[in-house]
UniProtKB/Swiss-Prot annotation:
Binding-site residues for carbamoyl phosphate, renumbered to this chain: 49-50, 99, 127, 130, 251-252
Pathway assigned to this chain's UniProt record: Pyrimidine metabolism; UMP biosynthesis via de novo pathway; (S)-dihydroorotate from bicarbonate: step 2/3
Gene transcribed to yield this protein: pyrB
GO molecular function, one term: aspartate carbamoyltransferase activity
Name of protein: Aspartate carbamoyltransferase catalytic subunit
Length: 295
């Protein structure tokens, strides 16, 4: 049984096959690959973009979508994770997409399911489809020439599952990664790191990936105000200038904290392209896992 718990679950050849399939899906035309199939989404954390993206992907492939309302589910009434898995499995879905605040939950569910489980984000651990869509966006922009491209990841890296998944995946494709964050947001790492964003760092980057400050994962107040954080880490036109690069963000963007209003409207900012690419990548992932499982 194949699952997608981390980006490591797909090798480089498989990822390139996903990219080829996703490129075809960018036309947004409905397909029937998963006609008659059922996909269950169960998100224990709030989500707009990721949940909507997965559900759009499933429907464009012809699948039915069952969204479980966690606030009203038995899990909110004390049901164990094992019982939740057993009940989900009894519904005989063809795939389950799960998001949870605790790292490891998708893997635990996968051990008890008879269908593919896709991790829609678990704690600080992983967000594999976000990393795949980010690399897909980079790959398309540079027409496949990504090896050696310099990417600067800026923000709350230590608490970000997006950063964790991207660092693993981008390293496999030999991108040159630099991390920029205040000391309390910087993980232990062998990668190049800086504690303040400046013009020189941006001038030496092909890609900037800005991250949201994960205030919900902080045990204590780090900044008196997010504006204090923005003074050192907000991506602004005055820093970027006319540098030829692309700017990414997994969303939601805290405007004028993560990225300035001016840069959000800049043609180098590909946030909306990431959203479009995300649906296509998730279509490719769902198709691959479900059809391989039943093949």
């Amino acid at each position: 049984m194949r699952h997608l718990i981390t980006a490591k679950d797909f090798n480089k050849v498989e990822i390139m096959e996903l990219f080829k399939e996703a490129s075809d899906f960018l036309d947004e035309k409905p397909r029937t690959f998963l006609k008659g199939k059922s996909i269950t989404t169960i998100f224990f954390e709030n989500s707009t973009r990721t949940l909507s993206s997965f559900e759009s992907a499933a429907r464009r492939l012809g699948a039915r979508v069952l969204r479980l309302d966690v606030s009203r589910s038995s899990s909110s009434k004390g049901e164990t994770l094992y019982d939740t898995a057993a009940n989900l499995d009894a519904m005989s879905p063809n795939a389950i997409v799960v998001r949870h605040a605790n790292s490891g939950v998708p893997l635990i569910l996968a051990k008890h399911m008879h269908c593919p489980v896709v991790n829609g984000g678990d704690g600080k651990h992983a967000h594999p489809t976000q990393a795949l869509l980010d690399l897909f966006t980079i790959y398309n922009h540079f027409q496949g020439d990504v090896e050696g491209k310099k990417i600067c990841i800026v923000g709350d890296i230590k608490n970000s599952r997006v950063a964790a998944s991207n660092i693993e995946l981008l390293s496999r494709f030999n991108l040159d990664i630099t991390l920029v964050a205040p000391p309390h947001f910087m993980p232990n790492t062998h990668l190049k790191k800086h504690y303040k964003l400046d013009e020189n760092i941006i001038a030496n980057s092909d890609i900037i990936m800005s991250l949201r400050t994960q205030t919900e994962r902080h045990n204590k107040t780090v900044y008196a105000s997010l504006k204090d954080y923005a003074n050192d880490f907000c991506i602004q036109k005055s820093l970027v200038k006319d540098k030829k690069l692309i700017l990414l963000h997994p969303g939601p963007v805290n405007r004028n904290i993560d990225i300035s209003d001016e840069m959000m409207s800049d043609e180098r900012t590909l946030v909306l392209k990431q959203v479009k690419n995300g649906v296509a990548i998730r279509m490719a992932v769902l198709k691959k896992l479900i059809l391989e499982n039943e093949g």
